[in-house]
Amino acid sequence: MTTTQEKTRCTISGRVQGVCFRAATQEQAVRLGVTGYARNLRDGRVEVLACGPPEAVAQLREWLHEGPPAATVESVACEPADDPAPAEFSVG
């Protein structure tokens, strides 16, 4: 039996750098069993790659709209990703 994996890349804009957004995203991802990464982009956004069971990836995507308490999320744009699924969730 093969488990279906979803891979999604999201870019989050707003006040999302310098507010522990990446670390909080990693905590949520690990809790949900999602692998991938969260990294700052030069333009002030954060990019998240989420790989895992579709329901877990959907929960993480939903959480990205709120983020940690210090963040102010203005928009979240997600699209399917073709990246290989990482073994863990990292912050870069």
Curated annotation (Swiss-Prot):
Gene3D superfamilies: 3.30.70.100. The active site is at residues 22, 40. Residues 7-92 form the Acylphosphatase-like domain. The keyword Transport does not apply. Pfam families: Acylphosphatase. SUPFAM superfamilies: Acylphosphatase/BLUF domain-like. InterPro entries: Acylphosphatase, Acylphosphatase-like_dom, Acylphosphatase-like_dom_sf, Acylphosphatase_CS. The keyword Cell cycle does not apply. GO terms for molecular function: acylphosphatase activity. It is an enzyme of class 3 (hydrolase). Its EC number is 3.6.1.7. It catalyses: an acyl phosphate + H2O = a carboxylate + phosphate + H(+). Keywords: Hydrolase. PANTHER family: ACYLPHOSPHATASE. Belongs to the acylphosphatase family. This is Acylphosphatase.
